A protein has these predicted regions:
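Conserved NTP-binding catalytic cores of kinases and kinase-like/nucleotidyltransferase enzymes
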Residues: 1-86, 285-292
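An alpha-helical support segment within catalytic cores of ATP-dependent transferases
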Residues: 18-31, 132-184, 194, 244
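A conserved alpha-helical element in kinase catalytic cores
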Residues: 24, 57-98, 106-130
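Active-site acidic catalytic loop and adjacent metal/ATP-binding pocket
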Residues: 48-54, 89, 166-212
Length: 292
């Protein structure tokens, strides 16, 4: 809950504080309307309030957010990915989603760092399943090109890093030969154990290059990855596994990682959050993606 409070107050100031204060009333109203019980806040909240509980006897997750547009998009994306390893949407509204809860619900982060090879293969299986989904004929999902327009803004990022990221972005976008519906944020905490299978949550929903999908996983978990003795070797191994399992060129995966990391740096600056992790990561992976 502390990270949620920090992020919301940093992004929304007094409006964010008011929303946080109103959460008990909002939660109680939703619980009453949808017959929810046993609601318990989860430990890893970042930008949305999330609680586990039950609807009758069915395990559920309740997600409430300030950004109704983002939640509406997430719900649409979960529905587009239906039957492709994602959580089922039970009910939704402008500021909330009630969805299937994974049981036992342990995340892929439990495999880090000791079983990172296995975790990366699980990631790849999840990606394969997700990318079987068709792009809906009518949708509100942005193309990756729209997402990366953020890099064209005036940003407090060193020129050589920003220029390289823009170069890689342009090269990758212009050489994309296949486009799929992307999860867009497929890191460890968004892949959960559900029985003997794995369930994906929290899709962002973008259209674009399949090679972009591993990027979120490659730079996570934050901050634990960079606290390891050999984080560079971990990332290199992950890239090689993803390349082999997904039949995607390793350089292309590495280039998207670099561009995505600079984008995350830009987002951190926009949201008044600490961006040091991204600076440190980019220094470490600099020669993964030579600017050619």
């Amino acid at each position: 809950m502390n990270e949620l409070k920090k992020n919301i107050t940093s992004m929304y100031n007094d409006e964010g504080k008011e929303w946080l204060d109103s959460l008990p009333d909002i939660t109680a109203k939703i619980a009453n309307e949808h017959n929810l019980s046993g609601l318990t806040p989860v430990n890893n909240m970042t930008f949305n309030y999330v609680a586990s509980g039950y609807q009758n006897d069915k395990p559920i997750i309740l997600k409430i957010g300030m950004n109704s547009k983002a939640l509406t998009k997430e719900s649409s994306c979960l529905k587009a990915f239906a039957k492709h390893a994602t959580a089922e949407v039970i009910a939704d509204d402008t500021n909330m989603i009630i969805m299937q809860r994974a049981v036992p619900g342990s995340t892929l982060k439990a495999h880090f760092p000791d079983n990172d090879i296995d975790a990366t293969k699980i990631l790849c299986e999840s990606i394969k399943e997700l990318h079987k989904a068709s792009i809906p004929e009518s949708h509100n999902f942005y193309h990756l090109s729209e997402l990366f327009k953020t890099l064209d803004q005036k940003l407090d990022i060193p020129d050589e890093i920003l220029s390289k990221a823009k170069h890689l972005r342009d090269k990758l976008l212009s050489t994309t030969t296949e486009e799929v519906l992307l999860h867009g944020d497929l890191h460890h905490d968004n892949i959960l154990k559900n029985g003997d299978r794995w369930l994906v949550i929290d899709p962002k929903g973008f259209i674009g290059d399949p090679a972009f999908e591993p990027a979120a996983y490659l730079c996570n978990p934050i901050p634990e990855l960079l606290q390891e003795n050999q984080p560079r070797e971990i990332i290199e191994n992950r890239i090689n596994i993803c390349s082999a399992e997904l039949d995607i060129d390793s350089r292309r995966i590495a280039d998207w990682l670099y561009a995505k990391s600079v984008l995350c740096w830009a987002w951190s600056l926009e949201d008044n959050l600490d961006a040091s992790y991204w600076h440190n990561l980019l220094e470490m992976i600099e020669n993964f993606s030579p600017c050619t």
